[in-house]
């Protein structure tokens, strides 16, 4: 009887030790796993910096021929409003439309169909509400966005869509961006698709 009781106590003690051990080890394992993942991401970002350190920023030229209509126009308005909200500033659609004036294109019913902008127009507009900084290289832009900054840019080979860069997917080698027309904050674009980026900070 005493032996049976002793066995029960021994089994209970082993189980208790096992539970305590698991509880003690788990946070360390999670921390190690998290640290390992962070290190991998940092290594991938470093590779991207090296790859793009000599790549210039792609921009439009300040000529009439280089002027592109930003289709729909809502993407420019949405990008500016998103940046405003990021800095707790409420920028109304009417305020933005008034600023662009005759650059705003409308249909016969008065609906906005686009906004015609070149690089100077784009830069001036962003600096009207924010401090818009020209990144001197692709690597610099990638680094700033990866470290929490945001940037407005024009997307695609026709430069006809305005979006806000929010982050970097180091695994895919792409920017993560907000799109006011398509919706969502998890859209992705290749670095080569980005034109006229401006790093946005509060004035």
Q: Whereabouts are the PLM-identified features?
A:
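Bacterial N-terminal signal peptides that target proteins for export
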Residues: 1-11
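Conserved active-site-adjacent core of cysteine acyl-enzyme catalytic domains
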Residues: 48-49, 84-87, 95-203
